[in-house]
């Protein structure tokens, strides 16, 4: 046990987390040079392309330290984005230490701070590392001062290294061994293992990535998952050295995988505790919570006959992403599709992109919404997570929207612009505290304002330094209305949005003018209207395309021309009655991007 070190790497996007991981794997000889490639642990194409880590990955490495002893290092690579903060907290709770990687040229950034606070709360030993010191712009003194100032941990002995060139990486490992405590736990106790992550493999079913806290697990043991109570026989256990390698047993302190012929990923919930049926653990490990989707959107296939394929693709994605929820829904404008729940906007984009890329789906996505509580005149209360299901305004007594408590951390230079942003988003300030140069702001903001683009706007007004985390507080009565879009008098249900009354006029006008730019001109006039109930708040017209029917007339009587023009007019009128306007895919996407100015 004394020679095991479990650690993860915390870093902001692009501070060199995956490159450092590559170097560590190379030094410890986890892969031969032939198998070595950039970003070994980011196995999804999408992860490589966006340069982000989505799923947690692990590598069990052995390293002979300078004191001559052989240490087992278990590296758990964590995602860094706020949408995946639950995944981060579970990866961290499986470790005793974390390498805090800070770009020496950029200093501390927001997501580093958020994840670092999570680590400190979980009692993880944080080891600061300055990366990219080979850059001419590197300023290690400033970065050290920032770590001490912002995060408040002692960084005087932060290890400088450059993951790209490989210099100093061994010093990082030495610092890790010196500072991070070995895992606690007793191999003789009943089994308790924390599920860090789980994914579906086409050959063996669900693979669970676990950290054994107490006890020992061998193949042929029967295990029970404590959140669901389901029982399975264990087929294989082992570790990843990034390649998988079967072992005889996994015991306390180790990080490895369990394969137990589980067919459904929903059975192996991330954060759940695994124990054995015989000699079961009395209680599960703390910190497990069901992940609730925060953002809903409709996903529809562009071709109606792709509906079954979309359902299969969602099922397959669900195998690897337990936080994705979906249920079938029908829209008049878009046909059959699914209402999906996501953790946040990045999660939504990633799911969409994976559907398009890995499963060749063509998708239409509706605007993201949150769940509203609607009290009707007859006294019943319904939950509305889809604008199309919002009752008529005449039947509504009041609408309550979800309010979240948002904690924001930022350097004091940006306080003004962040406060302005929160006020625009109808936020109410609850608290404000100064910690050195850092400021903590607490706001109550309607969730509907946050899902649209709050995070991106926050990052841009604070140059990426502000970090936020939010939790649901309550439902609160609010003056929100549903804005419907009509095209030639027909309601397009997929374009309905629920907004606050103060923004409804603006929003309606914006969407209408956006649609006017995007919908191609037809052979007849098209009227675009935005309405609240029966009240029209904005209108745009798309003028008809017309053929020049007079081109063939030379001279001659005016009545001849009039006859041709009248005939054209008649035809247009007839067309308008039978014609339907196709809304191109871009229109939906553009409408999602109508920002609240």
Swiss-Prot record:
Binding site for GTP: 14-19, 131-134
PANTHER family given in the database record: TRANSLATION FACTOR GUF1 HOMOLOG, CHLOROPLASTIC (PTHR43512:SF4), TRANSLATION FACTOR GUF1-RELATED (PTHR43512)
Cellular localisation: Cell inner membrane
Domain of life: Bacteria
Membrane topology label: Peripheral membrane protein
Taxonomic source organism: Paraburkholderia phymatum (strain DSM 17167 / CIP 108236 / LMG 21445 / STM815) (Burkholderia phymatum)
GO biological process terms held by the UniProt record: positive regulation of translation
Record-annotated tr-type G domain positions: 2-184
SUPFAM superfamilies linked to this entry: EF-G C-terminal domain-like, P-loop containing nucleoside triphosphate hydrolases, Translation proteins
Family to which the UniProt record says this protein belongs: Belongs to the TRAFAC class translation factor GTPase superfamily. Classic translation factor GTPase family. LepA subfamily.
Protein name as it appears in the record: Elongation factor 4
Catalytic activity: GTP + H2O = GDP + phosphate + H(+)
Pfam families per the UniProt record, alphabetical: EFG_C, GTP_EFTU, GTP_EFTU_D2, LepA_C
Biological role: Required for accurate and efficient protein synthesis under certain stress conditions. May act as a fidelity factor of the translation reaction, by catalyzing a one-codon backward translocation of tRNAs on improperly translocated ribosomes. Back-translocation proceeds from a post-translocation (POST) complex to a pre-translocation (PRE) complex, thus giving elongation factor G a second chance to translocate the tRNAs correctly. Binds to ribosomes in a GTP-dependent manner.
Classification via InterPro entries: EF-4 (IPR006297), EFG_III/V (IPR035647), EFG_V-like (IPR000640), EFTu-like_2 (IPR004161), G_TR_CS (IPR031157), LepA_C_sf (IPR038363), LepA_CTD (IPR013842), LepA_IV (IPR035654)
GO cellular component, one term: plasma membrane
E.C. designation(s): 3.6.5.n1
Keywords on record: Cell inner membrane, Cell membrane, GTP-binding, Hydrolase, Membrane, Nucleotide-binding, Protein biosynthesis
Stored SMART domains: EFG_C (SM00838)
GO MF, any single term: guanosine tetraphosphate binding
């Amino acid at each position: 046990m004394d020679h095991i070190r479990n650690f993860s790497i915390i870093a902001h996007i692009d501070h060199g987390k995956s490159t450092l991981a590559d170097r560590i794997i190379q030094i410890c000889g986890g892969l031969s040079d032939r198998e070595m490639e950039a970003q070994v642990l980011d196995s999804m194409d999408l992860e490589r392309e966006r340069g982000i880590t989505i799923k947690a990955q692990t590598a069990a490495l052995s390293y002979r330290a300078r004191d001559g002893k052989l240490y087992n290092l278990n590296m758990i690579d964590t995602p860094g984005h706020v949408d995946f903060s639950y995944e981060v907290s579970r990866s961290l709770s499986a470790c005793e230490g974390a390498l805090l990687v800070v770009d020496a040229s950029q200093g501390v950034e927001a997501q580093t701070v958020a994840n670092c606070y999570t680590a400190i709360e979980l009692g993880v030993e944080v080891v600061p590392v300055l990366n990219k010191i080979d850059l001419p712009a590197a300023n290690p003194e400033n970065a050290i001062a920032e770590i001490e100032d912002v995060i408040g941990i002692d960084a005087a002995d932060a290890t400088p290294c450059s993951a790209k060139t490989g210099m100093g990486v061994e010093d990082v490992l030495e610092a890790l061994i010196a500072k991070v405590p070995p895992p606690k736990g007793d191999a003789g106790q009943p089994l308790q293992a924390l599920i860090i992550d789980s994914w579906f493999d086409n050959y063996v079913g669900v693979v669970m990535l676990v950290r054994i806290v107490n006890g020992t697990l061998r193949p042929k043991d029967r295990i029970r998952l404590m959140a669901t109570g389901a029982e399975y026989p264990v087929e294989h256990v082992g570790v990843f050295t990034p390649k998988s390698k079967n072992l005889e047993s996994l015991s306390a302190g180790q990080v490895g995988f369990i394969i137990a012929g589980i067919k459904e990923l929903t059975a192996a919930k991330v954060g759940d505790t695994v124990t054995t049926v015989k000699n079961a653990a009395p209680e599960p490990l703390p910190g497990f919570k069901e992940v609730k989707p925060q953002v809903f959107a409709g996903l529809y296939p562009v071709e109606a006959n792709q509906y079954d394929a979309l359902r299969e693709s969602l099922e397959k994605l669900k195998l690897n992403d337990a936080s994705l929820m979906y249920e079938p829904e029908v829209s008049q404008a878009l046909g059959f599709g699914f209402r999906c729940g996501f953790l946040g906007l990045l999660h939504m984009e990633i799911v969409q992109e994976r559907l398009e890329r890995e499963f060749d789906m063509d998708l239409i996505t509706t605007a993201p919404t949150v769940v509203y509580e609607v009290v009707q005149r007859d006294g019943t209360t319904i939950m509305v997570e889809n604008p199309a299901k919002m009752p008529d305004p005449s039947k509504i007594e009041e609408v309550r929207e979800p309010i979240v408590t948002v904690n924001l951390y930022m350097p004091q230079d940006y306080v003004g612009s962040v406060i302005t942003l929160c006020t625009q988003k109808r936020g109410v300030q609850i608290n404000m505290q100064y910690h050195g140069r850092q400021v903590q702001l607490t706001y109550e903001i309607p969730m509907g304002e946050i899902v649209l683009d709050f995070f991106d706007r926050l990052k841009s007004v604070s140059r990426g330094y502000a970090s936020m985390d939010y939790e649901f507080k309550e439902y609160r009565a609010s003056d929100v209305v549903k804005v419907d879009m009509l095209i030639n008098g027909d309601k397009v249900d997929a374009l309905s949005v629920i907004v606050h009354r103060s923004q409804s006029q603006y929003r309606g006008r914006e969407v209408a003018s956006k649609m006017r730019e995007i919908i191609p001109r037809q052979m007849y006039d098209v009227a675009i209207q935005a309405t609240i109930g029966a009240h029209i708040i904005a209108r745009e017209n798309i003028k008809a395309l017309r053929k020049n029917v007079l081109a063939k007339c030379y001279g001659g009587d005016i009545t001849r021309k009039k006859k041709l023009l009248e005939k054209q007019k008649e035809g247009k009128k007839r067309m308008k009655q039978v014609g339907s306007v196709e809304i191109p895919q871009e229109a939906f996407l553009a409408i999602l991007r109508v920002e609240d100015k």
